[in-house]
Amino acid sequence: MLRSIGIDIVIVRGNAGLVHARSRQMRSLMVMGRSEDELWRDMDPVLRDLLDIEGDKVTTMTIDRPGRRVRVDVE
């Protein structure tokens, strides 16, 4: 069964950089990097691995960087 997950991204600026992701299914996820570009580059593999650990297979992932939103379809 296919279902969609919407994740809001909040960028927190600091020495290490930080992305905080929130959704109904995923209370929070924090990804640290040296720059905002690095954080966004790492977003796809980190989310795929996390969802795989949870037992969901990612079918599509759309990362809307300007809108600070990630949409994931899983089965």
Label each residue range with its predicted role.
Residues 27-37:
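A short, exposed loop/beta-hairpin motif centered on an aromatic-Gly-Thr core
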Residues 1-7, 12, 37-75:
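Short, charged, surface-exposed hinge/linker loops at domain edges
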Residues 12-26:
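Short aromatic-glycine-(Arg/Gly/Cys) micro-motifs in beta-strand/loop hairpins
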